[in-house]
Amino acid sequence: MLYPAELRYSKSHEWVKVEDGVTVVGISDFAQNALGDVVFVNLPAEGDSVTAGDAFGDVESVKAVSDLVSPVTGTVCAVNEDLLDAPETLNSDPYGAWIIKVENVEDSEELLDAAAYEAFCSEEG
């Protein structure tokens, strides 16, 4: 499993990176591995509000449908529409295939650094 040190992680297995004041959100390597082959992604629209700890979309894999949980509260300013045509990118490049970008961030869940997230994942098995 990969745990890039420059990212922060939620306990629901989303990663977070801040670029030029915008929060970028994706799913972790641990999440994509647990999901199996991703076949569909349901995304919010630009301008939608997201709330830390609440679902903002879902990912359908060959195993199950799983909620995407927002690690931050704010407004969606960009959606990775490439995932609609190529959802499997979440498997092949989980840290390159961002899902949404959020601006006007007001709040966030408790985010873990890479070492703490790796320890959390090893406890989850």
Set out the residue ranges of the language-model regions.
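Acidic, low-complexity mobile loops and tails
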Residues: M1-A55, S92-G125
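Basic/aromatic-rich interaction segments and small domains that mediate binding to polyanionic partners
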Residues: S12-E14, V79-P87, D93
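Short, conserved beta-turn/loop elements at beta-strand boundaries and strand-helix junctions
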Residues: V18-G21, V65, A78-D85, D107-E109
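Beta-solenoid/beta-rich acyl/carboxylate-transfer cores
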Residues: S49, D67, T73-T75
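Periplasm/extracytoplasmic soluble domains of Gram-negative envelope assemblies
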Residues: S61-A64, V72
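Histidine-anchored, small-residue-rich loop motif
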Residues: S70, E88, L112
